[in-house]
Amino acid sequence: METDRSRALLVSLAACLVALPAAAQTIVPTPAFNAIELEGGGHVTLRHGSVQQVRLLKGSTRFTRFIMERSQPHKLRIEACDNDCPHDYDLEVEITTPGIDTLAVSGGGRIESGGDFPARHQLTLAVDGGGTIDVRAMSSEGATAAVDGGGRILVNAQRELTAAINGGGKIRYWGAPRLTEAVEGGGSVEQGY
């Protein structure tokens, strides 16, 4: 009798372990977008590809919301964690996209680009209340970067960069752009190396 229970428990455990990888990589259906906002933490990796796709690598759609608003129909807003998520909740999202124009992080978290993206005409980047945007792998002719209340942006701008920091933060840039900057309340805008 005890052996049957043990065997049943092992079979159940094995079934759960086999199901975990599938659950951990959920495709999230979304309409087309060219802007992303990450709210409340987590990690988003951008990869270049001809077909746009959002994959949830860690986390759950039970706790994380992927929102497209009528007022901004081309922006994907990712709310990392609702009120019910566990204390140690870990969110990781991979987005494959042909291109993106606007990225924002608020309340912590990280958005980074990986791989090779074709050069963009213009990027708009904003961090509010902590977090990081690292798009060094995504070259652009021009960029606007703003940090408010802490955080950092790493950007590859070739011709023009408008950089603003309010209340602390860092903006690092690669390339040789014409720089227009405003810093109030601490922070720095510096060439990367």
Language model regions located:
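Bacterial N-terminal signal peptides that target proteins for export
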Residues: E2-V11
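Acidic (Asp/Glu) and glycine-rich low-complexity loops/linkers
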Residues: E2, A23-S106, R110-A126, A137-E141, ...
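N-terminal signal peptide c-region/cleavage motif recognized by signal peptidases
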Residues: A19-P21
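Short cationic/low-complexity microdomains
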Residues: G151-W174
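Periodic glycine anchor positions in long extracellular repeat architectures
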Residues: G41, G107-G109, G129-G131, G149-G151, ...
